[in-house]
Amino acid sequence: MKKFIVFLAPLFISTLLSAHPEEPTPPVSTDVMWHTITVVDYKPGTVDEAKALIQKFETASETSGTTLPVIYWFESGKYDLVVTWKLKDGPADLKGKWSPDGETWWNALIAQEGSEEAAIKLQADYNELIASSVTSVARKAK
């Protein structure tokens, strides 16, 4: 889970990059772009609160100069949100806990929130809003 702290903290953390250990890591190919795609179902009545917390995560990303994910809000169906992240180094970004961008983003979130404890609480508060999420790895031809 290297490239992660990805969606925005918990979206960065909880909903991104759930690579299953039994699944093999696909080979890297130069003719494709790799992404993670996460769909999120929030608990009833919590979407507005989730949007407010996501804004804080996005602000930390903008401050740190790290890449923002592409976010879509659903108007129908089971899920409320889909988040896609480009994996700069392909599936290798899924190994380990932190990428350099993730660490930079995390430090910006700590500075923004005033302490590491406050940043951790923000992540926990966000995670409490999630009823379920599913993350998959996808590739797209260049």
Where are these regions (language model features)?
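Positively charged n-region of N-terminal signal peptides that target proteins for export
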Residues: 1-4
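Bacterial N-terminal signal peptides
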Residues: 6-15
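Acidic/histidine-rich, surface-exposed loop or edge segments in extracytoplasmic proteins
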Residues: 30-41
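Short, surface-exposed ligand-recognition loops at beta-strand->loop->(often short) alpha-helix junctions
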Residues: 41-52
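A short beta-turn/loop motif at secondary-structure boundaries
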Residues: 72-79
